[in-house]
Amino acid sequence: MIIGDCCNFGEYNHLTAFKSIKIGNGVLTGRWVTISDNSHGETSLEHLKIPPAKRLIYSKGEIIIEDNVWIGDKATILVGVKIGENSVVTKDIPPYSVVVGNPVRIIKNI
């Protein structure tokens, strides 16, 4: 895990690195943020039928959070995510959605 200069993390943040998490300079997080490059299973319907505690730990890559990113309260950043510099998410994302891109678009509903 690499954390840049002048980062501020809110209360009760949870960071876990199985492979790699890179956080740039000047990153700000709210409270209760989770940043984890691993999960209990893949994002497929088959794996979702298995209770999370019984799934094998899975990681498909790293997390990169570039400079000057603001992550609000209760956000969850998972494996394979890259957040470009100076980014802030300002719109709702529907439940059970996988989103990508800038602007964000839904690529999968699970």
Language-model regions: role of each:
Residues 1-79, 110:
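Flexible, glycine/small-residue-enriched loop-and-beta-strand segment within the central core
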Residues 76-109:
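C-terminal/domain-terminus segments
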